[in-house]
């Protein structure tokens, strides 16, 4: 569960290392976001000469959370870190060309098939 002020690591090669959630999108008073939800983020730490700079405000999709993810078949998934993939604000396609670490099957919608295809492992 991600809320405003949550610090997340970035799971792509866009150049950002750490980002902070500044808004959970999808409702006027929505407090929490889970895997496959889109949030608004601010870049807090980035590498030099990267595609994104510190202080930029972008959209991101959550790919991993520390909070347990319960599936209908009874299985439970949990990750060590909260992670997201940065998205282009207008097209909502990933900025990076590589994804690091596993992503979940919950991202398998029309919007995020690009992330699924770039990921090394889908759980």
Curated annotation (Swiss-Prot):
GO BP field: translation
Keywords linked to the UniProt accession: Ribonucleoprotein, Ribosomal protein, RNA-binding, rRNA-binding
Domain of life: Bacteria
GO molecular function: large ribosomal subunit rRNA binding; structural constituent of ribosome
GO CC annotations on file: cytosolic large ribosomal subunit
Stored Gene3D superfamilies: Ribosomal protein L14
InterPro entries associated with the record: Ribosomal_uL14, Ribosomal_uL14_bac-type, Ribosomal_uL14_CS, Ribosomal_uL14_sf
Family per similarity comment: Belongs to the universal ribosomal protein uL14 family.
Assembly description: Part of the 50S ribosomal subunit. Forms a cluster with proteins L3 and L19. In the 70S ribosome, L14 and L19 interact and together make contacts with the 16S rRNA in bridges B5 and B8.
Described function: Binds to 23S rRNA. Forms part of two intersubunit bridges in the 70S ribosome.
Protein name listed in UniProt: Large ribosomal subunit protein uL14
Origin species: Wigglesworthia glossinidia brevipalpis
Gene responsible for this protein: rplN
């Amino acid at each position: 569960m991600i809320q405003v002020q949550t610090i997340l690591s970035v799971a792509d090669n866009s150049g950002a290392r750490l980002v902070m959630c500044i808004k959970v999108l999808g409702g006027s008073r929505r407090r929490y976001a889970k895997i496959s939800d889109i949030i608004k983020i601010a870049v807090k730490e980035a590498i030099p000469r990267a595609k994104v700079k510190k202080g930029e405000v972008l959209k991101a999709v959550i790919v991993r959370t520390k909070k347990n993810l319960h599936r209908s078949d009874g299985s439970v998934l949990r990750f060590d870190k909260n992670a997201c993939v940065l998205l282009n604000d207008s097209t909502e396609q990933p900025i990076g060309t590589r994804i690091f670490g596993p992503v979940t099957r919950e991202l398998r919608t029309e919007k995020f098939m690009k992330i699924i295809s770039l990921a090394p492992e889908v759980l």
